[in-house]
A protein has these predicted regions:
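Canonical Rossmann dinucleotide-binding motif of NAD(H)/NADP(H)-dependent dehydrogenases/reductases
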Residues: 1-28
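Conserved Rossmann-fold cofactor-binding substructure of NAD(P)-dependent oxidoreductases
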Residues: 59-75
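Rossmann-fold cofactor-recognition segment
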Residues: 44-62
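Conserved glycine-rich Rossmann-like NAD(P)H-binding loop of the short-chain dehydrogenase/reductase
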Residues: 24-39
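A glycine-rich helix->loop->beta "capping" turn
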Residues: 49-50, 70-82, 89-90, 116-119
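Catalytic loop of short-chain dehydrogenase/reductase
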Residues: 88-89, 117-186
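Hydrophobic positions on the long internal alpha-helix
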Residues: 67, 81, 107-111, 115-117, ...
Length: 186
């Protein structure tokens, strides 16, 4: 069985990482837009990579689990690349929190349960999480450690506490950094 790389988000950054790190691996590429995933698949297969695609929504735990199950059928999961997300200029606050914040937290949690010892992962994020007012130590801890199904219930993430889509995006990116830190030591 091959080592498996899970790639979420069929964009150019994800493809560049997969091309650099995915030689001799089975690559499972998931995206909400299956046509985007198929286009990246074709480019990569034409270049000699072994890629399968799956339609999946990062905001859905069920879709994440379906993708992980697919990956496990091909071998040992050794790598995760998360390049999925929505833009603050193109999505409402609720979608930003559900995809960029909650979805990334669920993905890290679920892949963390199955990735092989010595496995690696990268979550493409943004410096935007550092371009807002400083959070308290408690807020940072909550973003890092709150169980995923309770994450969107945090006071800091309630609509009345979020100024606009940019602020939601900044909070999501801060949460991404904190979740990666917390998951990396489990």
């Amino acid at each position: 069985m091959k080592e498996v790389m899970i790639v979420v988000g069929a964009g150019q950054i994800s493809m560049a990482i997969a091309r650099r790190m995915g030689a001799s691996k089975k690559i499972i590429l998931g995206d909400k837009n299956i046509e985007n995933a198929k286009n990246i698949q074709k480019t990569m297969v034409d270049a000699g990579f072994d890629v399968e695609v799956i339609e999946m929504d990062l905001s859905s735990r069920q879709d994440i689990l379906k993708m992980i199950d697919m990956a496990k059928n091909y071998g040992l999961i050794k790598m995760l690349v998360n390049g999925a997300g929505v833009s603050p200029s193109q999505a409402p606050i609720e979608a930003i929190l559900k995809v960029d914040l909650y979805g990334t937290a669920v993905l890290l949690e679920e892949v963390g349960k199955v990735i092989e010892e010595g496995g690696v992962g990268v979550t493409i994020s943004s410096q935007s999480g550092w371009r807002m007012e400083q959070l308290t130590a408690l807020e940072d801890e909550q973003l890092a450690c709150t169980p995923t199904e309770e994450l969107l219930d945090l006071e800091i993430l309630q609509p009345e506490n979020i100024k606009d889509t940019l602020h939601a995006y900044q909070l999501a990116k801060r949460c991404n950094e904190k979740r990666v830190m917390a998951e990396s030591v489990k």
